Amino acid sequence: MSESHLYTYGIIDDNESLALNVDGVAGATRAYTVSYRSLSAVVSDIETTDPERTDAAVEAHNTVLQAVLEHDATRAVVPMSFGMAFKNARTLKGVLRGARRALRSTLTEIAGTVELGVKVLAPGDDTAVDTAAVRSDVTARLSALSVGETENDCFTDRLIINKSYLVEHDTRDAFDAAIDEIDAAHDDLTVRYTGPWPPYNFVDIHIGAEQAQQGGR
């Protein structure tokens, strides 16, 4: 029988043990937590420390993180990038120990917030659109209701805006209402609103990659 390793999805506060029946990476059907002091890693069992990156695997990674958020909408989650698999719990706990200060700081920074995605697209025909005015209007409405925002790639000429916003739970309803107002004010455009997501675009922390690849030597 193959040795089981630990695939890691994200880091949360160690305020409770967590076990979720959810389809994860490499055929996993259950996600659970491995804890070190005030941190818990959300993991599932996996037979390799070098999982193949496929569209289905990335989707499964995101599905587990979504399930964590749905389990407790107020929970702060530091999402890990795809592919973080560790030889065993001892190796993972060692990484958590080494990165504890950075992880605790990040959890504090993102506590009480969620990431929301906003795309605004021009019509597919030749309808003239004042893109500068649209950007100005959308930015004015949404920036005041968020605590952070990032510009994402505009991968098609139709994309006028592609942004991620970090929004506090207390202002989420107001942000939702602002999206409805934008949609009504620009009925010739397509507004795509997604989330909540773990704050991928507002977390810049990389831990344990070398140890994961080396299998915890």
Curated annotation (Swiss-Prot):
Name under which the protein is recorded: Gas vesicle protein F2
Any single GO CC term annotated in Swiss-Prot or TrEMBL for this entry: cytoplasm
Induction: In PHH4 (a deletion of the p-vac locus) transcribed in all growth phases, maximal expression in mid-stationary phase. An unstable 6kb transcript able to cover gvpD-gvpE-gvpF-gvpG-gvpH-gvpI-gvpJ-gvpK-gvpL-gvpM is detected, as well as smaller transcripts. Gas vesicles appear earlier when grown in static culture, possibly due to O(2)-limitation.
Subunit structure: Binds GvpA.
Major subcellular location class: other
Transmembrane segments: none
Its job: A minor component of the gas vesicle, may be involved in preventing GvpA aggregation during gas vesicle nucleation. Gas vesicles are hollow, gas filled proteinaceous nanostructures found in several microbial planktonic microorganisms. They allow positioning of halobacteria at the optimal depth for growth in the poorly aerated, shallow brine pools of their habitat. Expression of 2 c-vac DNA fragments containing 2 divergently transcribed regions (gvpE-gvpF-gvpG-gvpH-gvpI-gvpJ-gvpK-gvpL-gvpM and gvpA-gvpC-gvpN-gvpO) allows H.volcanii to produce gas vesicles. Note that gvpD is not necessary for gas vesicle formation.
Keyword Cytoplasm: yes
Pfam family for this entry, one: GvpL_GvpF
Any further remark recorded for this protein: Encoded in a 14-gene locus called c-vac which produces cylindrical gas vesicles only in the stationary growth phase.
Entry's family note: Belongs to the gas vesicle GvpF/GvpL family.
Keyword hit for ATP-binding: no
Cell compartments where the protein resides: Gas vesicle; Cytoplasm
Assigned keywords, A-Z: Cytoplasm, Gas vesicle, Plasmid
An individual GO BP term: gas vesicle organization
